[in-house]
Amino acid sequence: GEDFEEVEAGAFIEYVASAMPLAPVSYRLLACEAIEQAAGVNDDPATTQARDSALERERIASHLGWLAQVGRQLGFTWLVHRASTLQLQVRDANRSRLVELEPALRALGTRLGRTPLLKARLKGIGVLPTESSDLRGPVARAANEGGDAWARLWQRLAEISASLDLIKGAGEPELPSLCDIGVVSGTGESTVDTPRGEARLSLSLEHGHVKSYKLDTACSHHIGLVAKLVEGRELGDALVAVGSLDLSPWEVAP
């Protein structure tokens, strides 16, 4: 990072998490892992499971937030209400509560599949140029399934189901917190699959302080797709196309 003043490791984690308000758990985990690698500290399996559960819970909540946004764009009031309500219920839920919410989450997917007007508005919208490269996350995974806004919707729904399954087999979700690293020095890096795709962080640690870092986010790669997606499109379709990328303004490099 440019214009970055050396900061204590714990404060750096808070800085990174608060700088990314749409995916704070993902970026907290990213910072913890990079610092722990720099310090030569390894997590125990229970901590890893708890962190993974928290990451998947954030993925579910994030995708529900995206679905609510789709509802707002298209004027589907029921979708805005249902997805927003579920998002709030998921955000801080423990494992047993998430299991309880599974039928409601699956029912939402079923209803979306039975909404012909939704398919009509999303199918063929936001098709990526064939030369698109370095795609990440749901945008990349949907590229082989039609690569349009409709495919991205179904990719995110599939990820909600997959995340639920992972949580059922993992530990109780816990916010990542830094292991005791002492005042060590070293370099570390980490990669986390955030709700919007892979984020990578490399950093330099000196006497327990982060001296410098470099952060690479999925959205910083996807922002370049916008111009092609809106070219020659009516405003409504252009907004849906861009919305289907789920860009976070905080995660787009200046």
Give residue spans per PLM region.
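Active-site bordering "gate/hinge" segments
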Residues: G1-P254
